[in-house]
A protein has these predicted regions:
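Terminal leader/tail segments of proteins
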Residues: 1-70
């Protein structure tokens, strides 16, 4: 398992200032951790959002989806 910060590539902000992280598991699953809560998951190339969240967390989810869904 590796944990790294979600970079802001598609979002207009320069950074998410350490509030959004990606957990990359060895089996290929990835999870988005926003404010210490798992809010999205990628399995087999598809992103699943695990609920509705604040505007900022929604930005994290959109960025995560644009970067990792194929």
């Amino acid at each position: 398992m590796k944990i790294f910060e979600l970079p802001a590539i598609y979002d207009s902000r320069k950074s998410f200032y350490g509030k959004a992280h990606i957990i990359d598991y060895e089996n290929g699953t990835m999870e988005l951790l926003s404010y210490n809560t798992i809010v999205s998951r990628v399995v087999n190339g598809k992103v699943k959002h695990l609920g509705k969240w604040s505007a900022t967390t929604s930005r994290h989810q959109k960025e995560f989806q644009k970067q990792f869904e194929y």
